């Protein structure tokens, strides 16, 4: 009976394809593009049929073909039926592939084409989007800045708006605090860079066709020294893919394992399929590559410092924030925003979701203190007391406050005695008993510039009230003072302060109301860091859930060579580098030294650059220019959407499309991985079907399709796509692997484009983070970390430290401090190695440059490209026909230099020079200049004083030095510069 069913299916296949082609243009076009013979047969020869595809038609022929272009062989009828089922069970299919119950031979391009055709026959009739009265169609999509409705008419985007929830969506949560009830507005809030996406899609800087550098010849002179100078000529996709695939094979044959390096940005376009932790890792693992590894560049001080006192290494040393929104609104008297400006950073991916909650706190009479070198946007919105502080000296103020707590008995003695170790040694240091220097408010004033009376007042108010500490953009972590030479000291001081006050007790916790809303976190949907379709269980968070719940083929990188991305220039230029890389699974892993080249591996000779730009995000980025032009780097390919600063150093450019031009699926703000439950930032938990709103512009393609095209030329396309799965097929597989089918059908989800997850009952919502520790209970928050082996007591009992308690003197650092005196077990105050306290440096460069995370763009995303973000005067200023990056300078410092509002100025030091437009303001501390990091523009011009960048790439000036000998963190905020009026007329690029 089952054999008869299989015969019937194979017999009917041509008719089904022809009917689908007649009805759907996408199937018709796909059918027209294929010219091949595909054969399906049983391994024992009992059944065989082949299909001839030619000139847009298909014919089925019984029996075997002598030379089929592609052949699929099945071990049994059951396997064959599973493989041809229009509603496949991928657990059965993947089992068949892994255990060779089914196999494919022949031309990879034919196998992939046939698989995609069969998938398209099944999906072409799926409906999505909502037709509007004005004739447009409304689609949904998700960005790094929040979810959008995208309106399209005649194949062109006409507008984008934040998603507004309606009565059919789940109810909002309600918090009751101090006699009032609070519920969030029923609309999504999004960041400026999200609303700029339409302008970015149609940017004149879009890369629409494959390009080759004019003086690059893969068969002859490569002229590596001309990268960044020479222009480009348009080539066909066939030419581009042939060159790239050929270079991959040449690298392997001529140089061996490790010759190909793949580099990606910290972030990319949103989505579980096209994100770099997904499709890129799958691609890279299949070809084998030297991993240019990311590091916690927004969390440096927490990872290299704070976690040694209490653990949480799998969160980069940052706490979890569960339940803190309600606890703060109910219990807290004071919020101290220390280097925390959530109104600029939007948390991470969450738009302005936290703004309303912070305004509730203001309505309730909760007081605010802001400690920052500038009167930042959060301080301006909320009001409160501003304590301007010299950059890099924050630890001195923190120590003085803790000194006052001790001498005035303003700390939680019982908590410290029962739940911590090492306090006696720490107390003696603060009181000066061990080094003869009491850390008094007067002592810190000389370092920080904060008046002793203000430090004393802060200590008194904080120590006598229930206080939330907001240390960084998320409330702990994400930018701020942790990104400096003293960043680890500062982050360590932050957790030490909380331990002294009774961390986890009602009203005493980390947070700035950016995270910790009431939410049902038992509902599962994967975040992007869970690896998407990568199949990589060692370098992503795939193993616990994603790999188990969504059957797919495992991939693994056979090359064991790694280079941290900030060390890539040294690796290429010098041929070697060493240091300490990020390890998200083990606290002690950060003490393991890496060496490049790794034994038995080749040096890097090819760089595959994927998206965005390092020049705007990595300190002392001028090093990358020299690396790109080094003769040992024989080939550079850049897969990018726009002609940004790093794309111009490529030999071959592959044009990728935006997230509005391809399919994907994801959840708002759910990155998972080391920001587990990051969706706890948003007011309404929402999963988004990222509709393909328009066709890709020009000849651009999705990242997934580009990888598939390259791998198909290498005979790996069928493996990469698991038999020809399209992005839409993968979306359906991810949907099925989640808890979404319990709430909504695939048909309805695809049509509407989003599904809100109800906040659930109180029992389904997480308890307050660290409350369990304060009350002496086992851990009860819903995070699968730390690992069982990291406990020194019973599983879930105590902290993952050597003692099981909070350690004022970190035992993990004590075991290693002889190797690195700048990272001692006792968190002693050490001045910055580059700062205004160093007179030799400060004479030439008396101003300290702070480059914060940008308010309007997302790193380089949305900057430049003539996007609407560039029209914002706080982001770029139009002077003489060119939009210049903005640098903020104190009124007094500007007057001394003859600088007026919006004058062009040269910001410079020994590392380089950048032309910016001045914003003269009283909101920046004297001696400090402030700007955003992450300019996407890099535009060197010739001047009598040498080369100067007018694009705004201030990371040319920041130091490439690591935080300390064994802490490979970056320290861009430890940067001295001088600022002078740029007297020359606006100039054109050289």
Question: What residues fall within each predicted segment?
Answer:
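Feature captures hydrophobic
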Residues: 1-130
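N-terminal export/assembly segments and adjacent metallocofactor-ligating motifs
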Residues: 126-410, 451, 494, 534-550, ...
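Short acidic, glycine/serine/threonine-rich loops at helix termini
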Residues: 161-163, 272-277, 346-350, 379-384, ...
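Long, contiguous, secondary-structure-rich segments that constitute the structural scaffold
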Residues: 182-189, 687-760, 839, 844, ...
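N-terminal leader/propeptide and maturation segments of large enzyme subunits in energy/redox metabolism
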Residues: 195-202, 206-239, 271, 408-456, ...
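Flexible, glycine/charged-enriched surface loops at secondary-structure junctions
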Residues: 255-259, 412-416, 469, 505-512, ...
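Extended redox/cofactor-interaction regions of prokaryotic respiratory oxidoreductases
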Residues: 276-360, 364-366, 370-371, 396, ...
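Flexible glycine/proline-rich, aromatic-decorated loop/lid segments
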Residues: 374-377, 645, 650-688
């Amino acid at each position: 009976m089952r054999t008869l069913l299989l015969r019937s299916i194979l017999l009917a296949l041509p008719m089904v394809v022809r009917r689908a082609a007649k009805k759907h243009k996408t199937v018709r076009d796909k059918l027209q593009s294929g010219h091949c013979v595909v054969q399906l047969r049983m391994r024992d020869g009992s059944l065989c049929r082949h299909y001839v595809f030619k000139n847009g038609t298909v014919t089925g022929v019984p029996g075997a073909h002598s030379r089929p272009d592609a052949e699929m062989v099945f071990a049994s009828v059951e396997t064959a039926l599973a493989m041809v089922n229009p509603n496949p069970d991928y657990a059965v299919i993947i089992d068949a592939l892994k255990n060779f119950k089914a196999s494919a031979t022949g031309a990879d391009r034919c196998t992939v084409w046939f698989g995609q055709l069969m998938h398209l026959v099944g999906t072409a009739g799926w409906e999505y989007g909502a037709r509007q009265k004005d004739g447009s169609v409304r689609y949904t999509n998700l960005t790094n800045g929040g979810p959008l409705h995208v309106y399209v008419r005649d194949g062109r985007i006409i507008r984008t708006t934040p998603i507004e929830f309606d009565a059919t969506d789940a109810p909002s949560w309600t918090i009751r605090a101090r006699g009032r009830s609070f519920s969030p507005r029923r609309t999504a809030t999004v960041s400026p860079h999200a609303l700029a996406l339409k302008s970015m899609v149609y940017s004149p800087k879009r890369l629409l066709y494959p390009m080759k550098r004019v003086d690059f010849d893969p068969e002859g002179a490569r002229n590596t020294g001309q990268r960044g100078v020479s222009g480009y000529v348009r080539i066909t996709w066939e030419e581009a893919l042939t060159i790239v695939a050929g270079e991959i094979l040449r690298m392997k044959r001529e140089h061996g394992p490790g010759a190909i390096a793949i580099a990606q940005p910290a972030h990319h376009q949103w989505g579980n399929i096209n994100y770099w932790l997904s499709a890129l890792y799958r691609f890279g693992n299949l070809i084998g590559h030297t991993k240019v590894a990311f590091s916690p560049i927004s969390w440096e001080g927490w990872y290299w410092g704070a976690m040694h006192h209490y653990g949480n290494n799998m969160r980069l040393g940052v706490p979890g924030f569960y339940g803190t929104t309600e606890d703060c609104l109910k219990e807290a008297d004071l919020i101290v925003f220390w280097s925390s400006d959530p109104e600029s950073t939007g948390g991470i991916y969450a738009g302005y979701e936290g703004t309303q909650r912070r305004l509730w706190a203001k309505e309730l009479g909760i007081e605010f203190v802001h400690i920052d070198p500038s009167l930042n946007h959060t301080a301006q919105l909320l009001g409160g007391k501003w304590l301007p502080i010299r950059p890099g000296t924050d630890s001195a103020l923190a120590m003085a406050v803790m000194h006052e707590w001790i001498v005035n008995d303003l700390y939680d003695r019982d908590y410290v005695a029962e739940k911590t170790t090492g306090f006696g040694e720490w107390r003696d240091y603060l009181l000066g008993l061990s080094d003869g220097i009491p850390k008094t408010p007067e002592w810190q004033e000389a370092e920080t510039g904060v008046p002793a009376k203000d430090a004393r007042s802060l200590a008194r108010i904080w120590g006598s009230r229930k206080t939330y500490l907001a240390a960084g953009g998320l409330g702990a972590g994400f930018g701020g003072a942790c990104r400096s030479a003293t960043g680890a000291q500062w982050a360590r001081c932050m957790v030490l302060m909380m331990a002294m006050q009774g961390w986890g007790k009602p009203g005493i916790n980390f947070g700035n109301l950016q995270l910790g809303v009431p939410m049902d976190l038992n509902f599962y949907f994967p975040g992007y860091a869970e690896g998407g379709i990568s199949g990589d269980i060692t370098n992503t968070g795939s193993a616990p859930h994603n790999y188990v719940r969504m059957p797919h083929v495992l991939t693994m990188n056979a090359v064991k060579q790694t280079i941290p991305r900030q060390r890539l220039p040294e690796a290429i230029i010098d041929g070697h580098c060493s240091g300490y890389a990020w390890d998200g699974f083990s606290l002690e892993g950060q003490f393991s030294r890496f060496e490049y080249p790794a034994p038995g591996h080749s040096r890097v000779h090819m760089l595959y650059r994927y998206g965005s730009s390092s020049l705007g995000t990595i300190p002392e980025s001028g090093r990358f220019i020299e690396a790109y032009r080094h003769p040992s780097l024989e080939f550079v390919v850049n897969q990018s959407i726009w002609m940004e600063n790093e794309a111009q150093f490529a030999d071959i450019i592959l044009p990728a499309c935006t997230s509005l031009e391809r399919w994907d699926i994801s959840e708002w703000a759910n990155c998972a991985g080391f920001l587990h439950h990051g969706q706890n930032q948003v007011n309404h938990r929402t999963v988004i079907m990222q509709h393909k709103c328009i066709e890709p512009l020009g000849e651009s393609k999705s990242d997934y399709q580009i990888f598939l095209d390259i791998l198909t030329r290498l005979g790996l396309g069928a493996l990469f796509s698991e038999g020809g799965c399209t992005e839409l097929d993968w979306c359906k597989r991810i949907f099925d692997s989640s808890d979404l089918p319990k709430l909504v059908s695939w048909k309805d989800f695809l049509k509407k484009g989003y599904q809100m997850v109800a906040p659930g009952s109180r029992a389904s919502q997480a308890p307050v983070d660290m409350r369990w520790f304060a009350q002496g209970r086992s851990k009860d928050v819903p995070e699968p970390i730390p690992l069982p082996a990291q406990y020194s007591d019973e599983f879930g009992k105590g902290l993952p430290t050597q003692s099981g308690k909070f350690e004022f003197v970190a035992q993990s650092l004590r075991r290693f401090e002889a190797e690195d005196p700048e990272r001692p077990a006792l968190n002693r105050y050490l001045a910055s190695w580059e700062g205004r306290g160093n007179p030799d440096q400060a004479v030439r460069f008396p101003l300290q440059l702070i480059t914060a995370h940008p308010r309007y763009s997302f790193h380089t995303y949305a900057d430049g490209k003539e996007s609407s973000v560039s029209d914002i005067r706080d982001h770029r200023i139009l002077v003489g026909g060119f939009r210049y990056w903005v640098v903020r300078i104190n009124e007094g410092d500007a007057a001394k230099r003859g600088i007026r509002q919006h004058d062009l100025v040269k910001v410079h030091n020994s590392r380089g020079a950048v032309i910016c437009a001045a914003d003269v303001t009283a909101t920046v501390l004297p001696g400090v200049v402030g700007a955003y990091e992450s300019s996407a523009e890099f535009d060197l011009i010739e001047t009598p004083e040498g080369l100067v960048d007018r694009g705004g790439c201030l990371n040319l000036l920041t130091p490439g030095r690591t935080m300390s000998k064994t802490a490979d963190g970056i320290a861009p905020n430890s940067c001295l510069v001088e600022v002078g009026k740029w007297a020359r007329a606006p100039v054109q690029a050289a």
